[in-house]
C-alpha cells in the first residue's frame, strides 16, 4: 500500500511539473510576442489548455507568472551570451544579434511600459546591468565601455533591424564596425599615451 501511495505521489508530482512547464512555455511565448498588458491569466490558460485557476495555483498571479517567465528567459539569454569568448568581437556580435532576433522585439515592448509597471522596470534594470557586465567581460575596453554598451544595446539592434530594415547579416556587420571602431579608438589612445610617457 505504501509503495502504491509513493508511486501515486511521484506520478502526481511529475504531472504537476509537466503542467507547470507547459504553462511557463506558453506564457513565455505570449510575453515574447505580445504587449505585457495583452497577456492575461485567461489567455495563458487557454494556450496551455488548463484552467485559469491552475495557472494561479502554480504562479499566484500575473506578476508571479511574469517573474517565472523572466527567470526562465534570463537563463536562456545568459546561456546564449555565455558562448561569446572575451576578445572575439565578431563572434560576440553574432551571438548578440542572434539573441536579439529572439528577444529584441519583446525587450522593446517591455521598455515602452517599464515606467508604469514596477515588475517590468525591475526586470529591465536587471537586463541593463547584465548587458553592461557582459560588455565589460567580452570587450575588456574600459575606456569605451559606455559607448560599447550603447552600440550593442537592443535599441541599436532595433534602429538597424526594424527601423532601417537591414537584414540580420547587415545588422551584424554594422554593429561589429561600430564596436571595432570604438575599441580601435581606445587602443590608439592608449598607444599615444605610452609614447608620450617615454
Please report, for each region that a protein language model flagged, where it lies by residue:
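Amphipathic alpha-helical packing segments from all-alpha helical-bundle domains
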Residues: 98-103, 118-146, 170-184
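Helical hydrophobic small-molecule/effector-binding pocket
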Residues: 64, 86-122
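Amphipathic alpha-helical linker/stalk segments
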Residues: 29, 33, 64-92
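Helix-turn-helix
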Residues: 22, 26, 30-64, 68
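Alpha-helical DNA-contacting segments of helix-turn-helix folds
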Residues: 59, 64-73, 114, 123, ...
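N-terminal intrinsically disordered/low-complexity leader segments
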Residues: 1-18, 190-198
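Amphipathic C-terminal alpha-helical segment
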Residues: 145-168, 180-190
Amino acid at each position: 500500500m505504501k509503495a502504491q501511495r509513493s508511486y501515486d505521489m511521484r506520478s502526481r508530482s511529475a504531472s504537476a511539473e509537466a503542467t507547470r512547464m507547459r504553462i511557463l512555455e506558453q506564457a513565455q511565448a505570449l510575453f515574447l510576442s505580445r504587449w505585457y498588458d495583452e497577456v492575461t491569466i485567461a489567455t495563458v490558460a487557454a494556450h496551455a489548455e488548463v484552467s485559469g485557476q491552475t495557472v494561479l495555483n502554480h504562479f499566484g498571479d500575473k506578476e508571479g507568472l511574469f517573474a517565472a517567465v523572466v527567470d526562465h528567459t534570463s537563463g536562456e539569454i545568459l546561456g546564449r551570451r555565455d558562448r561569446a569568448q572575451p576578445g572575439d568581437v565578431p563572434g560576440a556580435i553574432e551571438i548578440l544579434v542572434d539573441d536579439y532576433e529572439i528577444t529584441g522585439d519583446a525587450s522593446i515592448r517591455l521598455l515602452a511600459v517599464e515606467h508604469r509597471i514596477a515588475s517590468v522596470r525591475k526586470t529591465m534594470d536587471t537586463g541593463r546591468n547584465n548587458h553592461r557586465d557582459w560588455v565589460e567581460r567580452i570587450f575588456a575596453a574600459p575606456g569605451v565601455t559606455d559607448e560599447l554598451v550603447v552600440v550593442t544595446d537592443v535599441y541599436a539592434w532595433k534602429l538597424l533591424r526594424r527601423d532601417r530594415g537591414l537584414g540580420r547579416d547587415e545588422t551584424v556587420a554594422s554593429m561589429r564596425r561600430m564596436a571595432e571602431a570604438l575599441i580601435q579608438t581606445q587602443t590608439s589612445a592608449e598607444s599615444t599615451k605610452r609614447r608620450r610617457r617615454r
